[in-house]
Amino acid sequence: MYVKAEKFAQGGRSIGHLDDGRIVFIDGLFPDEEGEISIVDEKKDYCIATALSVALSSPQRRKSPCPFSSQCGGCLWIELDYDAQIQAKEALIEELFSDFPEITFEEPVTGPEFGYRSRARFQYTIRNGKASLGFCAESSNRNVEIKCCPVVDERLNDLIKNPPRLNAWELKDRELSCITTDEGVLYDDRTGWITVNDRRLPVSNKVFFQSNLILLPKLIDYVVSLTEGPKVMDLYSGVGTFSAFLEDRFDVTAVEINKACLSLARSHLKRTEFFTSPVEKWNPRTRQVNTVIVDPPRVGLDRKVPEMIASWKPDRIIYVSCFAPTMHRDIKRLKELGYEPQSLKVFDFYAQTPHVETCVLLVREREEDIDTVSIKVDLEGINIRQNKQLLPEKPTYEKIKVYVKEKYGFEVTSLYIAQVKDHMGLEKRANYNIGEGKAKVPNCPPEKAEAIVDAFRHFGMI
């Protein structure tokens, strides 16, 4: 089957159209390229395909610098010229946030496209008495043994060439998590230290820490430059990456649910006040705050958090995210609550992939700037039940599935949609959460829940 790729979709695949008009999401073709494809998943309204050959190649295509990229699948855009990667990421972000015309898109921050990752999770195997490291093949649990990886730190490549001999009890599910520190490479539970902007920060394989230590200082500097005091709240604070550079200038309160993160934060922060709590359940003693910084996981803010932050009436909110779709969802809600997104800056933390780190500044609208209009609606004589055209059409589960597939490139089930509806208190079908014999069924993965919530907003359900 021969297809032309038209543009990138959110998530990094290319979009094309089949002869019957259906959308096809393609791995292995870049925009304006043509080639033979193989359908790997077929639905009523769309398909997923992989390229078998490239007949008409883009001038932005290059030979892969990694001999394992075709098997590993971890670097979806490694055959795309780096300048073209940046342009594509900018275009995708601007498309996603196009419903905020007031946003200023600042110049993206870029860095080295190779050798930037300071941490990795390898698959560990022993064959013929010799240890080796690798990564999972794309959409598979199959291990791809590698001899090098162009995107990781040189010290991690040294580890790939000479992997340690470990006992089974030292591994978790045959995975080896590694992070480079000032002291060397850590692949156990010890604490190490990383120097960022002349300040030492604690890290370990048990907690999250940014993987791009080359661009992290620039992100920190940018966040600090946007912060106004005297009172600052650092929500989802982790090990205190931002608080470390704010506590000497502002009165900082940090909130983090992970006790291991807060333990590390307390080891180096002396002036910050800490709270161990889910952000959505935290009840601050004082609601006086000038700047709120949020750096949530991919799932974004809990649905209660935007209203909670808005009730404190901070002058500004700084939102940092590694997953722009959920950030967009949350900013849409924050705007409804009186916070206008002013600027957006992309940091290319993840070269060779479609992913970026994004920072948005939101500023509270002053009451005198808000125009109010009084509207009187005469409902006398109108029967809402008889005039269903007055109500928005209720989206079907199938429409939600198609929306998610077209925007995010993956599928969601009716079960997952029902679970998210249940979580949000929306009307749903019969209880999908209980299987035969009252057995519980799997919960919706966070990234799919994010996409479903976005679909709810798109269709006006929330």
Predicted segments, located by residue:
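Terminal RNA-binding accessory module
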Residues: 1-68, 140
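Rossmann-like S-adenosyl-L-methionine
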Residues: 4-10, 14, 181-389, 397-398
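Short nucleic-acid-contacting surface segments enriched for D/E, G, S/T with interspersed K/R
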Residues: 29-35, 156-158, 166, 170
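Short, conserved phosphate/pyrophosphate- and ester-handling motifs at nucleotide-, phospho-/glycolipid
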Residues: 32, 152, 212
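Extended interfacial segments that mediate partner engagement and assembly in macromolecular machines
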Residues: 52-64, 70-166
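Phospho-regulated, low-complexity intrinsically disordered regions of nuclear gene-regulatory
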Residues: 394, 443-462
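DNA-recognition alpha helix
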Residues: 396-408, 418-424
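Short Lys/Arg-enriched helix C-cap and helix-to-coil transition segments
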Residues: 428-439
